[in-house]
Amino acid sequence: MQQTIKEASAHTGLSAHTIRYYEREGLIPFLARDKNNNRIFDNDALHWLELLTCLRVTGMPLAKQKEIVELTKCGDETVSERIAVLKEHQADMYRRQAELDRAFKKIEKKLACYEELEQEVIKSVDQLS
């Protein structure tokens, strides 16, 4: 399946501007163009856009994303290095998830305190009426 940038944008949820930026940064390897020099997104290009979205959402720095792309361009002999980059990122994600879990619990406790206080205030106002 081959898609235009507009179709790729609709497929991935990325803006055409973001897709063009990714291409300028060299993050979409082997991107084809048609006879009019329009970008053509095949399944591999769409896969890269989806992966880049995932990596961005999970906080991988652009430099590390570029590293994965460059390693991929070098061929299968770099698969161990790509695994190492992704495992490092995954470990960072686990650390951040633990931090978020702790923060979430703290906020839940604070909300419970505020909601209890709010009920006490309502009860006090009702008693004064």
Model feature map: region roles:
Residues 1, 15, 58:
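Flexible coil/turn residues that form the inter-helical turn or adjacent wing/linker of helix-turn-helix
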Residues 4-5, 10, 29-32, 43-129:
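Arg/Lys-rich, alpha-helical DNA-contact motif
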Residues 8, 15-18:
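Short glycine/proline-centered loop/turn elements that form peptide/ligand docking sites
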Residues 10-13, 37:
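Conserved beta-strand-loop-alpha-helix junction that forms the acyl-donor binding cleft
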Residues 19-35:
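Major-groove DNA-recognition helix of helix-turn-helix-type DNA-binding domains
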Residues 36-42:
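Minor-groove-contacting beta-hairpin "wing" of winged helix-turn-helix DNA-binding domains
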